[in-house]
A protein has these predicted regions:
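Walker B catalytic acidic pair
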Residues: 125-127
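Conserved beta-strand scaffold positions in the cores of enzyme catalytic domains, especially
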Residues: 148, 166-168
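Conserved NTPase motor "head" modules and their coupling/switch loops across ABC/AAA+ ATPases, GTPases
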Residues: 2-121, 130-134, 138-141, 147, ...
Length: 175
């Protein structure tokens, strides 16, 4: 929980400016890390969190045995994404949720690069087809540096990409 909360804190700093630029300044992204455990401060040290987690497990042990499933733990934690104060999951359009997801992906990439001084390999599957031309240009300009693989069904979408190489695949074979 501690490490996830600290990573979300970094995402909270990195993703909103990316999303703001990506959306043309019209949307504000906010992130909240939630846990089903009784943890008042997920940013607390692991030493402080351990007794709280053990207590939570002990109190829910019988319910977990009865339901034959794990009712708490990191797999039950969640990252809540809001756009302009509203839940992206509940109220976001397909375009808004796609933009938010890509903003998070780009923020993760930039955090990794800042920590390691290396760009991670970035894989984007058919991402350009669902974006308008301004957002396509934003993505293509933002992913400079490192190794990037973009799948695309329409070659003209890659016209703004400089320094890249296109591979054509047909029927599962490289042409």
């Amino acid at each position: 929980i501690h490490y996830r909360a600290h990573f979300v804190k970094r995402l909270q700093e990195a993703a909103p400016p990316i999303h703001r630029d990506f959306s043309g300044g019209g949307e504000e992204l906010s992130l909240t890390y939630t846990t089903v455990s009784n943890i008042p401060d997920p940013l607390a040290s692991p030493k402080e969190l351990l007794p709280l987690l053990l207590d939570h497990q002990a109190r829910h042990k019988q319910a977990e045995l009865d339901s034959r499933q794990c009712l708490s733990g990191p797999h039950k934690d969640d990252l809540l994404v809001d756009i302009n104060g509203l839940s992206a999951k509940t109220y976001g359009s397909q375009g808004q949720t796609r933009t938010a997801a890509l903003s998070l992906k780009l923020a993760q990439r930039e955090i990794f690069q800042a920590e390691t001084e290396e760009w991670p390999v970035l894989l984007l599957d058919d991402v350009l087809s669902e974006l308008d031309s301004r957002r396509q240009a934003f993505i293509l300009n933002r992913i400079r540096g490192g190794q990037v693989f973009i799948t695309c069904c329409e070659e003209e979408k890659l016209e703004g990409l400089e320094g890249g190489k296109a591979f054509h695949v047909q029927g599962g074979s490289l042409i």
